[in-house]
């Protein structure tokens, strides 16, 4: 891990019980997992000049993220990460995200993916945090800007992402990366949705 920038931004990490065995293996122990996941959120916010406020990070399984995806984004399938931005007035940011460790395992197993499940999950936290701080990936130009921010944030935490063929553009959109759920009322850190 590289040294993190000075910040008054906190990142609280909740790891669901189902994720604990895998994360203990990937990160060495749960405390290291919490620390690295928090650092990923803080790094992503810092890339966009947000260094005050809080980001909640919840790591869950596909069975947990599926109904959240259905309720807030009307997508009836599990996904990798969903963001809930609550307030953004840089340098202040408030939001939460939920990410699936099982989707990280599945996506990291793809032959074309050079990332380990640990790195894939850290990328989900970075990606979700970038949605919280205002990034969009629904069209090519914003998607390319988001990809550059992902590369910068991952580098801050010591992970080099592979560049696309054209360094200034993002790879084809990965449909597993979801929009933010900005119309939501939140509550993902408490372990459920209404």
Curated annotation (Swiss-Prot):
Cofactor: binding comment: Binds 1 zinc ion.
Gene Ontology biological process terms from the UniProt entry: rRNA processing
Cellular component aspect of the GO annotation: cytoplasm
Family assignment from sequence similarity: Belongs to the endoribonuclease YbeY family.
GO molecular function: metalloendopeptidase activity; RNA endonuclease activity; zinc ion binding
The protein's name: Endoribonuclease YbeY
Positions with biased composition (Acidic residues): 165-182
Species: Rhodopirellula baltica (strain DSM 10527 / NCIMB 13988 / SH1)
Domain of life: Bacteria
Region named Disordered: 162-194
Keyword Iron set for record: no
Cofactors demanded by this protein: Zn(2+)
Class of the enzyme per the UniProt entry, highest EC level: hydrolase
EC number of this enzyme: 3.1.-.-
Any Pfam family matching the protein: YbeY
InterPro entries: MetalPrtase_cat_dom_sf_prd, YbeY, YbeY_CS
Chief location of this protein within or outside the cell: cytoplasm
Keywords: Cytoplasm, Endonuclease, Hydrolase, Metal-binding, Nuclease, Ribosome biogenesis, rRNA processing, Zinc
Gene3D superfamilies: Metalloproteases ('zincins'), catalytic domain (3.40.390.30)
Function as written in the Swiss-Prot or TrEMBL entry: Single strand-specific metallo-endoribonuclease involved in late-stage 70S ribosome quality control and in maturation of the 3' terminus of the 16S rRNA.
Coiled coil start-end: none
Keyword Zinc: yes
Gene: ybeY
Localisation per UniProt entry: Cytoplasm
């Amino acid at each position: 891990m590289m040294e993190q920038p000075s910040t008054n931004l906190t990142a609280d990490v909740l790891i669901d019980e189902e994720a604990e065995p895998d994360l203990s293996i990937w990160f060495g122990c749960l405390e290291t997992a919490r620390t690295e996941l928090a650092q990923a959120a803080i790094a992503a916010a810092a890339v966009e000049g947000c260094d005050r406020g809080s980001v909640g990070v919840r790591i869950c399984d596909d069975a947990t993220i599926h109904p959240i995806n259905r309720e807030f984004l009307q997508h009836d399938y599990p996904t990798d990460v969903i963001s809930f931005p609550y307030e953004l007035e840089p340098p202040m940011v408030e939001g939460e995200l939920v990410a699936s460790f099982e989707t990280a395992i599945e996506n990291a197993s793809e032959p074309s993916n050079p990332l380990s499940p640990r790195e894939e999950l850290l990328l989900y936290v970075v990606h979700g945090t970038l949605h919280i701080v205002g990034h969009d990936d629904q069209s090519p130009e914003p998607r390319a800007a988001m990809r550059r921010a992902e590369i910068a944030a991952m580098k801050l935490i010591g992970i080099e992402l592979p560049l696309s063929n054209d360094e200034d553009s993002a790879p084809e959109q990965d449909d597993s990366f979801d929009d933010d759920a900005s119309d939501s009322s939140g509550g993902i850190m408490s372990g459920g949705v209404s």
